[in-house]
């Protein structure tokens, strides 16, 4: 924890000649950083009568909040759902490699697995601050096993579960301690799901609806019970129907609690979601859209077979299938690619595309005071981008942690 006294004595960095994303607008302003946080320059000038200790010219580039990926199953040969004696080293490798894609924080995601896998893996993935070693870990996302058999997608049917009479006790028996967990994806049509949603949210865990055949009413009741997120909208759920739009209908439902914003993940990899579907969702509910990669261990690798939890996926070009099927088995597109594709597919503003990968996931997790923005007092986690939104440099707590060759600052 950075104390005020330590921060006050730290050097002041001034990033100049840049466009910073703040308040939904790209502003031609300087970015001031001290002690790992975004600094208000007026207080520096008028209260402390100080100037910057160091200036860095950004060459007119964009400075945006660091990307946050709340659904990533692994990457670069690492499978988060594989129970080993040293899960941490794999998480560290992925965290390090994500820096080149502008990701400063992420939620390692475990797909449906037997209880012994959760019991072994979860204690090995603690919440961890980011830095030169890699992107920060915000908590684990547990996707399954309490999901629909019909909409299980890439999840192995043998390990799917329903809630027993003592529902939350069953959750704890399956997962073990939830200290390192920040999101749980479940199907709201399962019996006793609302009891579980209430228990999870009481512990500060976000509940996401997904891999589900729920109708709209069941989804609305789940949100009224505390659910706040939808896992990869359109994928692994009932298709939109005009008489019952299912979970998709939450985007425009008038039955949600007053002031409640439902967030929803979208895989904008050019494979999982048609551009027209991206446009429909964004135009219906832009402030809730959260870009996710749903990346699998094959991210960053070539064609061939790779693991995903208890199954294998086969990569063919830009597509990952469950081996021997035509069922999609996650994505192999990193977050910066998803941001660029989303921008092109929807025709939205650059600001909107960047906020979908930063501010919105931070808001969904309740971290918007420290992550996902360049507001004064927020963590100085940001990405430097050129006009085509290619990553030039990544900073965590104001420290340069990755830089493209021949790029600055």
Swiss-Prot record:
Cofactors required: a divalent metal cation
Q: What UniProt keywords apply to this chain's record, in alphabetical order?
A: Carbohydrate metabolism, Hydrolase, Metal-binding
Q: Which residues bind a divalent metal cation?
A: 143, 211, 232
Top EC category:
hydrolase
Q: Does the keyword Metal-binding apply?
A: yes
* Residues bound to substrate: 154-155, 235-236, 243, 269-272, 328-330
- What family does this belong to? Belongs to the metallo-dependent hydrolases superfamily. NagA family.
Q: What is this protein called?
A: N-acetylglucosamine-6-phosphate deacetylase
Q: Lineage, please?
A: Eukaryota, Metazoa, Chordata, Craniata, Vertebrata
């Amino acid at each position: 924890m950075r104390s005020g006294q330590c921060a006050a004595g730290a050097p002041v960095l001034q990033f100049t000649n840049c466009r910073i994303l703040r308040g939904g607008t790209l502003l031609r302003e300087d970015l001031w950083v001290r002690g790992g946080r975004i600094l208000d320059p007026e207080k520096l000038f008028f209260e402390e009568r100080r100037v910057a200790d160091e200036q860095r010219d950004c060459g007119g580039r964009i400075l945006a909040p660091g990307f946050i990926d709340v659904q990533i199953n692994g990457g670069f040969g690492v499978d988060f759902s594989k129970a080993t004696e040293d899960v941490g080293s794999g998480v560290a490798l992925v965290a390090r490699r994500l820096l080149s894609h502008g990701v400063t924080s992420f939620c390692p995601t475990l797909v449906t697995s037997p209880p012994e896998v959760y019991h072994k893996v979860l204690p090995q993935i603690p919440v961890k601050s980011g830095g030169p070693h890699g992107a920060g870990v915000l908590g684990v996302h547990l996707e399954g096993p309490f999901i629909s058999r019909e909409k299980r997608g890439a999840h192995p049917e043998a390990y799917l579960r329903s809630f027993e009479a003592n529902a939350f006790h069953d959750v704890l028996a399956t997962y073990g301690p939830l200290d390192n967990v920040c999101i749980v994806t479940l199907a709201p049509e399962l019996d006793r799901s609302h009891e579980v949603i209430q228990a999870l949210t009481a512990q500060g865990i976000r509940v996401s609806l997904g891999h589900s055949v729920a109708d709209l009413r069941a989804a609305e009741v789940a949100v009224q019970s505390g659910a706040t997120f939808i896992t990869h909208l359109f994928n692994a759920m009932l298709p939109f129907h005009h008489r019952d739009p299912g979970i998709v209908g939450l985007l425009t439902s008038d039955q949600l609690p007053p002031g409640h914003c439902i967030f929803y993940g979208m895989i904008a990899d050019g494979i999982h979601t048609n551009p027209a579907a991206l446009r429909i969702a964004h135009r219906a509910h832009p402030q809730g859209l959260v870009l996710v990669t749903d990346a699998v261990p094959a991210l960053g690798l070539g064609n061939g077979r790779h693991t995903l939890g208890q199954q294998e996926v086969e990569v063919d070009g830009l597509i990952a299938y469950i081996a021997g099927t035509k069922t999609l088995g996650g994505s192999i597109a990193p977050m910066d690619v998803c941001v660029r594709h989303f921008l092109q597919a929807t025709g939205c503003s650059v600001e909107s595309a960047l906020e979908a990968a930063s501010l919105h996931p931070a808001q969904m997790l309740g971290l918007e005071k420290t992550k996902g923005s360049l507001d004064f007092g927020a963590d100085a986690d940001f990405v430097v981008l050129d006009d085509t939104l290619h990553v030039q440099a990544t900073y965590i707590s104001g420290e340069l942690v990755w830089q493209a060759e021949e790029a600055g600052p």
